[in-house]
Curated annotation (Swiss-Prot):
Superkingdom of origin: Bacteria
Protein name: DNA repair protein RecO
Family: Belongs to the RecO family.
Taxonomic classification: Bacteria, Bacillati, Cyanobacteriota, Cyanophyceae, Gloeobacterales
PANTHER family, per the entry: DNA REPAIR PROTEIN RECO (PTHR33991:SF1)
Length: 261
């Protein structure tokens, strides 16, 4: 293998048409972080590599380093998630996670933790019942933010730094997390959360949700909006998948779990 040729294991996050028959792939790899590579001829009807370029396919890849873009020369499929394609809500939630990862991930350095965590949450989403998608999405979003060091603070007041437990609180997007009630005058607060909402937010820091909490749809739908605001503020760009997600969650929605001020 030449010095310009390398191998990696990656999850396809995005694909865009390029020229008449090529695809521009954006792939999260364990070994090199985000890789942007051209798949030559991948859009042709008889392309051998075609199906391996679909979104969320996990491949063993061989790539060639180019001046501006790498080239995808070989791909061997290791894993697919057919469950994501069977439900629009699951697929949209997975695209939401992918969009967040695209904002968070870096190029040219290993991203093992981010890669492994995304794989876990895609597996959970692909297998989850439709009525638990909101829970799986919100937990995945928080966990992916945490591994990147940009998750909001959910256990301590961001003003006084005292622990917050079993109580109502505010949430400041600009301040990066929860604000104790006695500190509300010192921080701009975009959301007011009751005890249940604070407890649900704090559960997101655990490795997995409790079985009972998976059915707290009205809480998770509200907290998705809160985390969305946090992501959009931190990365200074909107999450496009959120628009379709609102439509998917509309039948489940009741009064919002996190109320913007």
């Amino acid at each position: 293998m030449s010095g310009k040729t390398y191998r990696a294991t990656g999850i396809n996050l995005r694909r865009m048409p390029l020229g008449e028959s090529d695809l521009l792939m954006t792939i999260l790899t364990r070994e090199n972080g985000l890789v942007r590579a051209v798949a030559r001829g991948a859009r042709k009807a008889n392309a051998r590599i075609g199906g391996r370029t679909e979104q969320f396919v996990v491949n063993d890849l061989q790539l060639y380093r180019g001046r501006s873009l790498d080239q995808l020369t070989q791909a061997e499929s290791l894993r697919t998630f057919p469950g994501l394609l069977q439900d629009l809500g699951r697929l949209t939630a997975a695209q939401y996670l992918a969009e967040g990862v695209l904002q968070e991930a870096t190029e040219g350095q290993a991203q093992e933790d981010l890669y492994d965590l995304l794989l876990v949450h895609l597996e959970r989403l692909a297998a989850t019942p439709s009525h638990q998608i909101a829970a799986r999405l919100v937990h995945g979003v928080y966990q992916l933010l945490a591994v990147g060091g940009v998750a909001p603070e959910v256990h301590f007041c961001t003003v006084s730094h005292r622990p917050i437990s079993a109580e109502s609180a505010g949430f400041s997007v600009e301040g990066g997390g929860l604000v104790a009630l006695e500190c509300l005058s010192h921080e701009r607060v975009g959301f007011r959360l009751d005890i249940e909402q604070v407890a649900a937010l704090q559960l997101l820091a655990d490795a997995d949700l409790t079985p009972a909490s998976l059915d707290w749809n009205y809480l998770w739908i509200g907290l998705e909006r809160l985390l969305r605001r946090h992501i959009e503020f931190h990365f200074d760009r909107p999450l496009r998948a959120a628009t379709l997600l609102e439509i998917c969650f509309e039948p489940l929605a009741v009064p919002a779990a996190a109320s913007p001020q």
